[in-house]
């Protein structure tokens, strides 16, 4: 290349030098020409080394920024009350998942298998919040999919590939970011087959969806339409490799406790050697779910292949009244803290009495909505006050007690004391 440039310049005896290190064309193996500059092969190699070192430093920084399981648990504790066992299971599983991604980049001899997660717990026990908090902590793209809207390809409804498209939308169609994101699939128990006989129960929104999700969860290259794909059909589909995407599936699995109990009872046997079943030994649902085995999930209606793709199972307990009261007051995003902030922006103090918090928790337990129903209850009792308050003057405090939660009275408004009018001076 340098000889061609010499020929064009008309000066065949001119010696060319590297613009970076100053070596002549005779001192190096190759001299590459650019617009009025030259670079030798040695400088190219040096540039490659510099770039390689910077990439390794970035990778090392990413490794050091990955929080340890204990640090993950500490953050989860700030947002999710209770569920210690589930939080520990998640912390370890997520930490190992991202370590696995690092090991793949090193071309290690040992290949680590992917460990997706199944969350089993009652409605409102914190499954979705756990997944959201994890994604926020790790600063990775996160999306939630509803399993009940998914159908097999070719039928009316959402294809499973739509999940990956939602994940891409969350990171502005950055494929590299999406490939290390987290997907939470909710209501996974609703796609269970209704019988253990697959030949008569296969349907487009049940077992069929489980089959469609298998490859996606295990790791495959999904073809996803680009941004505005229908408007620009000539664009090529984006190829997203799902092998490093962490899938967390969650569901209430109503009735699973009975399946577990049935297995335990069958294991007890019959006859004189059988264990005596007593009503006093009746366990709480949360403790029963903690004993779940893969065979129980299969009997419930998940196909064996799907259960095998979710090796990490974390069970959540049903929240009791003390736990719900803590949820109302302790987390960073506690509901009472949020409403106090809203009232504070109006210059008004909001107070929840202890009996009010207890009444809110009892009402949520009665509705069987768990923590999810707490906000609805608080919204309903404060709606009229929040409507009237901006138009009222001199209100300094709003007090909510049990009678307000039971709709027996309105929130108590406390007004600022008006300054006494100044007396006019009496004339002599």
Swiss-Prot record:
GO molecular function: ATP binding; ATP hydrolysis activity; ATP-dependent protein folding chaperone; protein dimerization activity; unfolded protein binding; zinc ion binding
Any GO CC annotation of this UniProt entry: HslUV protease complex
Domain (ClpX-type ZB): residue spans on this chain: 6-59
Alphabetically ordered keywords of this record: ATP-binding, Chaperone, Metal-binding, Nucleotide-binding, Zinc
Family matches, as PROSITE patterns: CLPX_ZB (PS51902)
Function: ATP-dependent specificity component of the Clp protease. It directs the protease to specific substrates. Can perform chaperone functions in the absence of ClpP.
Protein name: ATP-dependent Clp protease ATP-binding subunit ClpX
Protein species of origin: Xanthomonas oryzae pv. oryzae (strain KACC10331 / KXO85)
Gene name tied to this protein: clpX
């Amino acid at each position: 290349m340098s000889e061609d440039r010499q020929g064009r310049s008309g000066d065949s005896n001119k010696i060319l030098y590297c613009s970076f290190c100053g070596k002549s064309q005779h001192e190096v193996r190759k001299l590459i020409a650019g617009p009025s500059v030259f670079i030798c092969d040695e400088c190219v190699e040096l540039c490659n080394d510099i770039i390689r070192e910077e990439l390794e430093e970035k990778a090392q920084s990413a490794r050091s920024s990955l929080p340890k399981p204990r640090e993950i648990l500490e953050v989860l504790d700030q947002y999710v009350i209770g569920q210690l066992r589930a939080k520990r299971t998640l912390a370890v599983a997520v930490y190992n998942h991202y370590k696995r991604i690092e090991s793949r980049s090193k071309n290690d001899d040992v290949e680590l298998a992917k460990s997706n997660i199944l969350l089993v717990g009652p409605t409102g026990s914190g499954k979705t919040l756990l997944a959201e908090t994890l994604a926020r902590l790790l600063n990775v793209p996160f999306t939630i999919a509803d399993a009940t809207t998914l159908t097999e390809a070719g039928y009316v409804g959402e294809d499973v590939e739509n999940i990956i498209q939602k994940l891409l939308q969350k990171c502005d169609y950055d494929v590299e970011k999406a490939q290390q994101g987290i997907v939470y699939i909710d209501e996974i128990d609703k796609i269970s087959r209704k019988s253990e006989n697959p030949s008569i129960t296969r349907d487009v929104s049940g077992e069929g969806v489980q089959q469609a999700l298998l490859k996606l969860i295990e790791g495959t290259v999904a073809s996803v339409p680009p941004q505005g794909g229908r408007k620009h059909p000539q664009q090529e589909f984006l190829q997203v490799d799902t092998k490093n995407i962490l899938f967390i599936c969650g569901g209430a699995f109503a009735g699973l406790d009975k399946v577990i109990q049935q297995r335990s009872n069958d294991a007890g046997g019959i006859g004189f050697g059988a264990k005596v079943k007593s009503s006093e030994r009746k366990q709480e649902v949360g403790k029963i779910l903690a004993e779940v085995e893969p065979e129980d999930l299969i009997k419930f209606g998940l196909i064996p292949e799907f259960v095998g793709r979710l090796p990490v199972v974390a069970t959540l307990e049903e929240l009791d009244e003390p736990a719900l009261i803590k949820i109302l007051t302790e987390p960073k995003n506690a509901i009472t803290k949020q409403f106090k902030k809203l009232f504070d922006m109006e210059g008004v103090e909001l107070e929840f009495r202890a009996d009010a918090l207890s009444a809110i928790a009892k009402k949520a337990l009665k509705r069987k909505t768990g923590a999810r129903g707490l906000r609805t209850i608080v919204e309903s009792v404060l709606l009229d006050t929040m409507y009237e308050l901006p138009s009222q003057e001199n209100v300094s405090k709003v007090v909510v007690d049990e009678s307000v939660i039971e709709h027996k009275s309105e929130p108590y408004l406390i007004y600022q004391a008006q300054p006494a009018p100044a007396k006019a001076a009496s004339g002599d």
